[in-house]
From Swiss-Prot:
<comment type="function">
    <text>Involved in pinching off the separated nuclei at the cleavage furrow and in cytokinesis. Required for mitotic integrity and maintenance of chromosomal stability. Protects cells against mitotic errors, centrosomal amplification, micronucleus formation and aneuploidy. Plays a key role of midbody function involving abscission of the daughter cells during cytokinesis and appropriate chromosomal and nuclear segregation into the daughter cells.</text>
</comment>
<keyword id="KW-0677">Repeat</keyword>
<feature type="repeat" description="Kelch 5">
    <location>
        <begin position="176"/>
        <end position="222"/>
    </location>
</feature>
<dbReference type="GO" id="GO:0098813">
    <property type="term" value="P:nuclear chromosome segregation"/>
</dbReference>
<dbReference type="InterPro" id="IPR015915">
    <property type="entry name" value="Kelch-typ_b-propeller"/>
</dbReference>
<feature type="repeat" description="Kelch 1">
    <location>
        <begin position="1"/>
        <end position="31"/>
    </location>
</feature>
<dbReference type="InterPro" id="IPR051746">
    <property type="entry name" value="Kelch_domain_containing_8"/>
</dbReference>
<dbReference type="GO" id="GO:0140014">
    <property type="term" value="P:mitotic nuclear division"/>
</dbReference>
<feature type="repeat" description="Kelch 3">
    <location>
        <begin position="81"/>
        <end position="127"/>
    </location>
</feature>
<feature type="repeat" description="Kelch 2">
    <location>
        <begin position="32"/>
        <end position="79"/>
    </location>
</feature>
<keyword id="KW-0132">Cell division</keyword>
<dbReference type="GO" id="GO:0030496">
    <property type="term" value="C:midbody"/>
</dbReference>
<dbReference type="GO" id="GO:0045171">
    <property type="term" value="C:intercellular bridge"/>
</dbReference>
<dbReference type="GO" id="GO:0110070">
    <property type="term" value="C:cellularization cleavage furrow"/>
</dbReference>
<feature type="repeat" description="Kelch 6">
    <location>
        <begin position="224"/>
        <end position="281"/>
    </location>
</feature>
<dbReference type="Pfam" id="PF24681">
    <property type="entry name" value="Kelch_KLHDC2_KLHL20_DRC7"/>
</dbReference>
<keyword id="KW-0880">Kelch repeat</keyword>
Amino acid sequence: MAAGGGRAFAWQVFPPMPTCRVYGTVAHQDGHLLVLGGCGRAGLPLDTAETLDMGSHTWLALAPLPTARAGAAAVVLGKQVLVVGGVDEVQSPVAAVEAFLADEGRWERRATLPQAAMGVATVERDGMVYALGGMGPDTAPQAQVLVYEPRRDCWLSLPSMPTPCYGASTFLHGNKIYVLGGRQGKLPVTAFEAFDLETRTWTRHPSLPSRRAFAGCAMAEGSVFSLGGLQQPGPHNFYSRPHFVNTVEMFDLEHGSWTKLPRSLRMRDKRADFVVGSLGGNIVAIGGLGNQPCPLASVESFSLARRRWEVLPAMPTARCSCSSLQAGPRLFVIGGVAQGPSQAVEALCLRDGV
């Protein structure tokens, strides 16, 4: 499917992971795709660590994680990959922070989080790691904001988020970290807030127009997008239970307001728990769950220039609950759930002259 200007999307299929998994933690470092932890077929967190050499297309086993975990956050710091939080074998959030030293092929423990947490959002800026929110062992959402200083191996507290949450989407834009959505228990959060890294202050922006769980979020060209998800019942709709939607809501950072796009500009497929990203001026939505009895393979893109949705080549392996990672012109879709935990590793690529 053409993307304009002689560019097109295509899928690149990589060798499957040796270990099938869902909720794995992924990182891209020096031409290698690292997949760490996650849940396997038994439904328990793994300590398995594997890396795909992007040049030779071969998988290698790495030293196992000191702490088996799923749903952790990962940040690349030069030759190190920092793994933060997550959930352990007894389904309890962990405080453990560990660093994989790529040149030495081994793990080192780092200063732990002040509180155990899963669903922590992390952002790297100028060699510092910012950790926002999370859910603690008491299942309460957290508002904590921390910064990790690698040289001192310590976490420092910053002003708390106005809205506690876990599993939020975060975007670094200029000198601000934008935090969108997330959850409080089973309830989706509509808050949209920004932390100024220079003044270390929070700004509340207008909330999402609609309350949706498992929506997909992306930032592109000065706008933030919130797509699809499970619409929650409320006083302004006729549904008594959550239902899949194809909603598209866009926040313009310059004007500071949300726009709910009309029906003609909604996604073609209603979906939730899917992968979303930005490639070459297009917002892409991949896979997920919809009204069908099995995960979706469908893929579509919204062109910011032409303001319309287009159908893209289907994902080779239909999946939901995937890990994802963007590296240059590739959006990787890793693991997830098909019939069970998946080994699939595929990347949607934007190519010139295809």
